[in-house]
Amino acid sequence: EAGVLQGLFIFSARTEWDAAPNRLTPLLSRLRAGRVPLIDLTESNPTRCGLIFPDQEILRFLSNPESLTYDPDPKGMPVAREAVAADYRGRGVEISSERILLTASSSEAYSFLFRLLAAPGDPVLVPAPCYPLFELLARINDVVLHPYTLDAGHRFSIDLDEVGREIATIRPRALLVVSPGNPTGTYLKRGEMETLSRICAAASVPIICDEVFGDYALAEDATRAATMIGPGPALTFVLNGLSKMLALPQLKLGWIAVSGPEGAAAEAMRRLEVIADTFLSVNTPVQNALPGLLALRPRIQAQVLERLAINSRQIVRSAGSEGPCRCLP
């Protein structure tokens, strides 16, 4: 890759991004410098949103004396991987702890998977609209994103025909699905999941499914796909972690759950283990704490769901019937 000369030093072109501030950045800096009270509707840090965490329990779980001993496992400590598998089993989802690989974050999970599946310049299909971070992750990992359409007229559902055409045309190294979508909030339907899995299996295209916000649906929907983990025909990687599931991003723990055809899943895990062994990025205290932390999930998520319901009702009231925006049913 061509370098970019800055003085006497050459930097990679992949890091030549636009660092210029937008129009809001200097204004926000001035207001904060002047200690002007602000209502920030873009705040995404859950530790700053007034949630009440079981602090003493969390600290107790993190104070396990066994964390003073270092015994690394590239896939993640067995006690932690089994805790993740047990949490899924509690939801009626069967997966072996041997098909779970721990990471320090979802971003790291994406990086591992891009390295596993794609060579530099290879295409990856992503939904449009989607989370802006994907573009940065793709650039850092030397893959090229190609969008597929989410139909705004049908609650941002996936255009399955377009996905089929794109797969046949560009032959992507992976298909990325986000359920619920960010920023759309739309969950993958069971019928969509089954069709996507068939399409991708027929073309030998793995699926990466981001389910980090999956626990926060505000209403029941019998057609919703609870998860893409399962014995589908396509090799599938499901991402989740503590940042969203427990609103604890500072603990830095995510995971990849691998499912699909047994031979492909086993080979994917073998290769992922080598990638993870190169970094060994997940800290020991959070892995030892994970069984206890996951037991707190119902209490923490109840607060988040209540806040989401309140915010949703307020948005619906504020939008009205003649406002500049409308709420989808």
Task: Label each region the model flagged.
Residues 6-7, 14-105, 112, 162, ...:
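N-terminal small-domain helix-loop-helix segment of the aminotransferase-like
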Residues 34, 141, 170, 202-203, ...:
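Helix C-cap/helix->beta junction micro-motif
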Residues 46-49, 308-309, 321-329:
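Conserved PLP-binding catalytic core of the aspartate aminotransferase-like
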Residues 67-198, 214-230, 237:
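Conserved core of the PLP fold type I
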Residues 179, 207-208:
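Residue-level marker for buried hydrophobic side chains located in beta-strands
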Residues 211:
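Walker B catalytic acidic pair
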Residues 229-309, 313-320:
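Conserved core segment of the aminotransferase class I/II
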